[in-house]
Amino acid sequence: NESLGITPEDFANISSIFFISYLIFQIPSSIGLQKLGARKWISSIIIGWGAVTGLIFFAKDTQHILLARIFLGVFEAGFFPGMVYYLACWFPARERGKVNSFFMLSIAVASVLAAPMSGWIIEHLNTPDYEGWRWLFAIEGIPTVFLGILTFYLLPDSPEKAKWLTPQQISALVNKLRTDNETAAALNKNTNSSFLSVIKNPVLLQLSFAYMLIQAAALAANYWLPGLVKGFSADFTDTDVGLIMSIPFIFAMFSMPWWGWHSDKKNERKWHAALPMFLAGCGFLMIALVPSMSLRMLGLTFYGVGILSYYGPYWALPSALLSPSGLAISIAFINSCSSLGGFLINKSLGFVSIHY
C-alpha cells in the first residue's frame, strides 16, 4: 500500500473489482469447461492465473493492480466451480463429502505454508529496486504457470479416459455415477438445462443465498484479517502476523477431512454445512468484541476451522439436490453469488474503514 500510494478506498476498490470479472465469467467459464473438457480448460485457467500473478511484480501504480485484479477474476472464475463439477463427475454421491473436503484441504495447507512464507518474503526480500511484495507475487506466480502446463499433460477429462483404471473399474464407476445421476434427476422433474430454467429452481436460489452470505464473510476476512491481527499488538511484525494467521488453518487441516468423512458416514449434509458456519460466526464475534488476546486467538481458530470445514458437506449438496443436466451451470451460479457477496462486503468495509 505504501509503495504504490494505495489509500483504504483504493484498497477496497482493488479488493472489490476482482469480483466483477469473477461474477461475469462464471457461467461462460462453465460452458467452456463442457465444450473443451477439463484438461484443456482447467490447465488454461491455471496458466493464465499464474501469469497474471507473476506480472504484478512489474506494477507501477494503482491502475496496474486494478487491471491485474480484473484479469485474475477472469481466470479464477472458472477454476473452483470447474473443479467441484469435475469431482462430481468422478466420485459417487456417498463419497463427495470427504472428497470435497480433501480438495478444500489444499486451502488450509496453502494457508499454513503461505502465510508465514509471505510474511518472511515481504520482510526479508527487499532490494533497492524491488520491494518484498513484488517478489512475493513473482515467487507465487511462476510455479503456478508450470503446474498449469503439467495439468494439461496429466489431467484426464473423464473416468473413461483414465489410463490407470482397468476396463472393469471404469465400467463399475460409470455405472455407479449413472445411478447417482438418475437418483438426483428423479428429485428434479425439470430436465431443461437452459440457463433461465436452471436458475429458477428455488433450491438453487436457497443454496446460492447461503453461500453468498458465508463467502462474503470469508472473502472479507482474507483481505482484512491480517490488518486486524497486526492491530492486536504494536510489536507484531509481518512475519509474526503470517505465523499467527497460519494457526487456524493448522487446526482446519485436521477438522476438514474428519468432518467430511463424518458427513459421508451419516449421509447428512445440511447440518454438517450449517454448524461450521455457526462456529465461524462465533469466531468473528470474538475477534471483534472480546478484549482478551487469548480469546481473540481462540476466535481466530474458531473462524478458520468453521470457514473451511463447511465446504465439503456444502458442496456435496448441489449434486444431490439439483438436476444433473444443469449441474455445471448450477455450480457456477452458486459460486457467482459468492463474488457478489465479496464485492458488496469489500466496498462496505472500505467505506467503514474511511468514515469510522
Task: Please annotate each region the language model reported.
Residues 97-129, 141-144, 335-345:
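Glycine-rich segments within core transmembrane alpha-helices of 12-TM secondary carriers
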Residues 93, 103-105, 128-195:
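Central mid-sequence intracellular linker of multi-pass
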Residues 265-317:
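C-terminal transmembrane helical hairpin of 12-TM major facilitator-type secondary transporters
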Residues 34-46, 264-277:
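Cytoplasmic membrane-interface "Motif A"-like loop-to-helix N-cap segments
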Residues 25-37, 122, 254-268, 353-354:
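Helix-to-loop junctions at the C-terminal end of transmembrane segments
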Residues 194-260, 311, 315, 345-349:
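Extracytoplasmic gate region of multi-pass secondary transporters
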Residues 23-63:
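Conserved MFS/SLC helix-loop-helix module at the cytosolic interface between two early adjacent transmembrane helices
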Residues 5, 37, 58-64, 75, ...:
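Helix-breaking motifs and short loop linkers at transmembrane-helix boundaries and internal kinks
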